[in-house]
Amino acid sequence: RLASDQPHGGMPYGLPGVSREEFNHLQNWLKGGGKMSHIQPPSKYDQNKIAGWEAFLNQDSLKYQLSARYIYEHWFLAHIYFTSENPQSFFKLVRSSTPPGEEIKLINTRRPYDDPKVSRVYYRFMQERTTILSKTHLPLELNEAKLLRLYEQFIAPDYTVTKMPSYEAKAASNPFKTFEVIPINSKYQFMLD
């Protein structure tokens, strides 16, 4: 009946039936504030790796800033982890109004190229705290070789950034215009990687 009443409504939300005991358990949990289990903070290993990556992504030169913006706009959906024998945590690359070393003040926008409404954006690694689902899990491993590769692709080439591109929607939504000063080969190789 729902399908005929609302042909464009999509699949209805629903949960499998739960027993009275399970329902009471959920209800009591919610009454108690719905507290989630504690998530361990990042390991010292991850913290050290984050410090190195954030130092790379947040340098003052316009060349670094534009490169970081390009990288962010391509990695914002990734679940990032750092090479180790037993990776335990995933991170998201986010935009923040605060520099490394300070608490992250997340810049929430609908799209990665929307206007952050701050004069300087910092790219930070925030620990992923949500449940990771297979259909949205895009793991991305970061290591020293990847960092060197990004340097070779975006910083080493001889080009000059004289000003940061606008976040005005018409311009920012066109990556060919926004990142036109970055060498084509750098962008091409980045996409292949």
Over which residues does each language-model region extend?
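Aromatic- and Gly/Pro-enriched helix-to-coil junctions and flexible linker segments
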Residues: 1-193
